[in-house]
Amino acid sequence: MTGESGAAAAPSITLNDEHTMPVLGLGVAELSDDETERAVSAALEIGCRLIDTAYAYGNEAAVGRAIAASGVAREELFVTTKLATPDQGFTRSQEACRASLDRLGLDYVDLYLIHWPAPPVGKYVDAWGGMIQSRGEGHARSIGVSNFTAEHIENLIDLTFVTPAVNQIELHPLLNQDELRKANAQHTVVTQSYCPLALGRLLDNPTVTSIASEYVKTPAQVLLRWNLQLGNAVVVRSARPERIASNFDVFDFELAAEHMDALGGLNDGTRVREDPLTYAGT
């Protein structure tokens, strides 16, 4: 299946709850309502089926409008949203899920994530309990976490006996998250990457541009392909339709092992987003 741009539809990965999720999706963090509607519409047109938003982004309603206008059948879509830190708690997380559904104009989300563990707040386990309830009531097909460390995930599993389906984390060659990816895999948790382009910081990197020229691909396409070949699912943000089409045109080539290693070797621990160990969350 291809969209008008020629970009192939992303393959899917099976989660530990047996639901399936596309391996590549559109993120809409920090986009205005107008930008969000245009971006989601453009993504759906070229075959993207995973849309990732959050209460904290303030654009759930815009995502919902674009989905409604697209004519794409609900069962073809995979919609993710996230629980904000102020809504952590057993009851509040369930109320927040229903409120997100109202804004999205949907009966359920495919994936509901705790946006940040927010250790200073100390409520993520209670929030997880509420999300288990939301899943049981059919408001969320799958539930997971974002920005969680291995210790946070182990704590959830030990206290609730329910394993997250996904851990969405900052991941790019400057922060390759090898140890956390291994820990996720040990618990059958899918690693989903955000900021795969390191907010653009890697687009002019000599290693990246050199590899891109060898494959006659853009630096962004090479960075996305690297992430996908690690076995990760990926969410990539863009407001520009032509860039969205290019970002999803990454399934017709494969990076050689030496190029994978060269990109992974750029790891220096650089974060472009907040540190989950100390951040109180949004």
Swiss-Prot record:
The active site is at Y57 (proton donor). NADPH binds at L197, V235, R237, S238, A239, R243, S246, N247, R273. Its EC number is 1.1.1.-. The keyword Oxidoreductase applies. It is an enzyme of class 1 (oxidoreductase). It holds the Pfam family Aldo_ket_red. Belongs to the aldo/keto reductase family. This is Aldo-keto reductase BQ2027_MB2996. It comes from Mycobacterium bovis (strain ATCC BAA-935 / AF2122/97).
